[in-house]
Amino acid sequence: MLKKVNRHLKSKIGKSTQAYAIPDLWTKGVHDLETLQFTKSGEALTDPYAFYSALIEKHFLNTEKKSATPLSNRKKHHAVGGDWLKESIIYSSMVRTSAAWDNDRSGFLEEKNRFGFKETGTFLKMIALLPSLKDMGIDTLYMLPIMVYSTKHKKGELGSPYGVNDFFKLDDSLKDDLLSESFTVEDEFKAFVDAAHTIGIRIVIDIIPRTNGIDSELIRDHPDWFYWIKASEKHKYKTPYVDAFSEAKAPLPKRMKTVYESEDVKRHIHMFEHNPKAQDETLFESIKESPDILDAIERHFDLTTAPAFSDNINDPPPPWSDVTFFRRYMDHPKETRTYLKDPDIPPYIL
């Protein structure tokens, strides 16, 4: 895939701006590229197609370096505890920020700049970081969420990558405008992984099963994997407060009796409802393929997914309007079920 990407980049050299700004750190190994003009501000101006092509050829194509050593060849791989991780030097990265740059020097990071290119990070831009990471001794790159995420009730302009909408699709915003529509975001991710493996860097992906987007695609087939409240009561939904504690506390088992005696906790637990499929399976099946599944459920069932919030008791921040918790168990916690008057109450977040 790297060769295919490089062929496309080479075909576009000379057909774009010569003032595409990049940090000079990215130019390692290609400092002598004719199209590079270095500035006093630590940047270089260049033809983006010429730069990325030269970078790929220098570090990833014209090389005799071996790819990342298979884990099966690691002497300690089969020992208890994941020894390959213990030996690794790991760098954590969020693509859209780690590889972001003000490429047109406008003073703003733009989703589409005056050259027609996005300035947030992409898999292609991440390739430019790999040589420097390798020089730092990094041999494992831990990728924070790269899946499609929800933008419903998003916080900020872009939304949270921790509000995953679909665990089986990559985030299209990580595709680079420099590559044509003949390349998918999956193709560009493959090229990035190929590049990393070529210089001995492994890729680890953060799957984050704890949280989901409030309108996760999994709702269509597994509404019972989520927590539900009445949509008409969402404005009343808030983090419960336990008067017996004057400050935030860790949710330890020894404190649970006091927590469940709190009137506000009782109010909170009673807000939860059974999932829409459990309430009316026929109706749910008739709407499950709606373009906006959560909107359809809110209209037909007056239900919505319960926003997540901090685990700590009396933690001040409000609920997170853009993410919901993924239900990991099909029963109530054994440490707290003794405090429930009705063991058959709907699943709840606390």
Label every model-predicted segment:
Residues M1-L350:
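Acidic/aromatic-lined carbohydrate-recognition and catalytic surfaces
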